[in-house]
Amino acid sequence: VKKYILLNCKRLVSFLKILVSLVFIQSIANYANAKIVSSVKPIGFIAEAIASGVTDTDILLPDGASPHTYNLKPSDLAKLKSAELVIWVGEDMEAFMPTILKSIDNQNQIELMTIPEIKVLLRTSHDVHEHEEHHSADMTAQDHHGEYDEHIWLSPNIAKIIAQSIHDRLITLYPDKSVLVDENLREFNVKLAEIEQNIAKKLITVQNRGYFVFHDAYGYFEARFGLKRLGSFTINPAVQPGVQKVYAIQQELKEHKAVCVFHEPQFSPAVIEKLVDGTDVRIGELNPLGTGIALSKDAYSQFLLKLTQQLLDCLDRN
């Protein structure tokens, strides 16, 4: 009887192993269904607008993940290798991409930072810090690892070029759907022009209200809409800063008469509250990656409008 039970247990374990393997394989296959894969959400929003009704799109990084520190999973590799088109920013933004993309034909990917029309619109690190009014060396930091600010999706002008590049590649991949691709691009450009005008009207009332950020990511958006970023601070988002650091930041906030300081979702509220304690500075949240926004044809517009509202929620309080 014991031998019989033991034999059946072994068979059950073997069966469960096979079942788990099949589920894992199927899950990877499901991940690999999308034909167009974008590295980060805002780029994926643009891709979805142009590819809507043409083919499926997906986004590599999950909500809350940073493109600077992300580690690829097996399902990510399957997704990238099976995609007909991979869209990414550049190696200084997604350091994890170049190695895996060596196995993908150049015709199957768009590295946005290499597009000539985008290159001429790039902001350098020098541009970013000229925009700031203070030069506190031990508290100002570049988020960018390279010479240029690679948060290019925050520029409406560059977004139009990204959309055009995706359009051109889709025409090649799906010539039988060229009419729909053309119409999607036209709709995207019309909608974006309307959104730009809307945002400009909303933000004109807060253009002279200075603020600090904890992520040097918003230069393109700030330049387009004339916003007054005073500078940026660098702290560990999960660790309480020391007394000297807190005092130095508070002095900066007071000296420059900052209205707000903006953090991102990964920052502990307790850390930010400690930094503004004893000042009149308000706390706001900004998100440059579109966290919480679902992938849809209008997602890029929703992304820009949400960012605008986040700015207004803090800067426009009386």
Language-model segments: residues:
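Extracytoplasmic metal-acquisition and chelation regions
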Residues: 31-318
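N-terminal secretory signal peptides that target proteins for export/translocation
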Residues: 1-11
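Bacterial N-terminal signal peptides
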Residues: 14-27
